[in-house]
Amino acid sequence: MSDILSRIETYKRAEIEAARAARPQAETEAAARAADPVRPFAKALEAKIAAGQTALIAEIKKASPSKGLIRPDFDPPVLARAYEDGGAACLSILTDGPSFQGAPEYLIAARAQVSLPVLRKDFLFDTYQVAEARAWGADCILVIMAAVDDALARDLVEAATDFGMDSIIEVHDEAELDRALALPSKLIGINNRNLRTFETTLATSGRLAPRVPKDRIVIGESGIFTHADVKLLRQVGIASILVGESLMRQEDVTSATRTLLNG
């Protein structure tokens, strides 16, 4: 695990214990089961792909550790509607505070304004966080293979499945991809960012995508800024993308989303 992920795991585990002390797991799971019905995340991507379109997971992100503040004018419900109007298939919403200035309230408020399924974008180290995500209304979780071992990854995916949620399994290299393919999830995210150097290259997607079986959906993540990037990924068989920063920096998010998808 990289030094960055080790630091993140330390504060996340402290957050989890504080949250569990404030609301025990059984109570959180009960809230999860009473939450608004799950919106099928993978099916929303499949529908766009079946229609010959690029399935965009549009990210609502205020800041990042590498870039600092990305969008000062940050209004999650307004951004959610802009993405939906622009043709996004799903939303990704940061709930991590220390590194990304995210919050659960952003997910709750944004999801209430749209009909799109929503990913809780965060660093998950405990099944408590899966119950928490569903209680807030999330329809999908992210499992980062660079941050967890195989047993924990499976526990997270199975917890999500138990709540009717989907899971994106994120990988950065061949070894992580091999581990990810052993998990019962249809969604494989290829992150083009090197977690040690923070450099991005779409060549990562080009290298890994052909290794993924055709019954999975491959999602390109990081380093996607233009319609040319989208076309490049489609050439290697990637018809779904997760994009945040490049859209968050635009004044007219709806127009920028349409341009990214359609040119």
Swiss-Prot record:
A GO MF label: indole-3-glycerol-phosphate synthase activity
Catalytic activity: 1-(2-carboxyphenylamino)-1-deoxy-D-ribulose 5-phosphate + H(+) = (1S,2R)-1-C-(indol-3-yl)glycerol 3-phosphate + CO2 + H2O
NCBIfam families in alphabetical order: PRK00278.1-2 (NF001370), PRK00278.1-6 (NF001373), PRK00278.2-4 (NF001377)
BP terms from Gene Ontology: L-tryptophan biosynthetic process
Annotated gene: trpC
Keyword Amino-acid biosynthesis: yes
Pathway info: Amino-acid biosynthesis; L-tryptophan biosynthesis; L-tryptophan from chorismate: step 4/5
HAMAP family reported in the protein's UniProt record: IGPS_B
EC number per UniProt: 4.1.1.48
Group of enzyme by EC: lyase
Family annotation (InterPro entries): Aldolase_TIM, Indole-3-glycerol_P_synth, Indole-3-glycerol_P_synth_dom, Indole-3-GlycerolPSynthase_CS, RibuloseP-bd_barrel
Organism domain of life: Bacteria
Protein name per UniProt: Indole-3-glycerol phosphate synthase
PROSITE patterns noted in UniProt: IGPS (PS00614)
Membership in a protein family: Belongs to the TrpC family.
KW Lyase (keyword) present: yes
Keywords: Amino-acid biosynthesis, Aromatic amino acid biosynthesis, Decarboxylase, Lyase, Tryptophan biosynthesis
Chain coiled-coil ranges: none
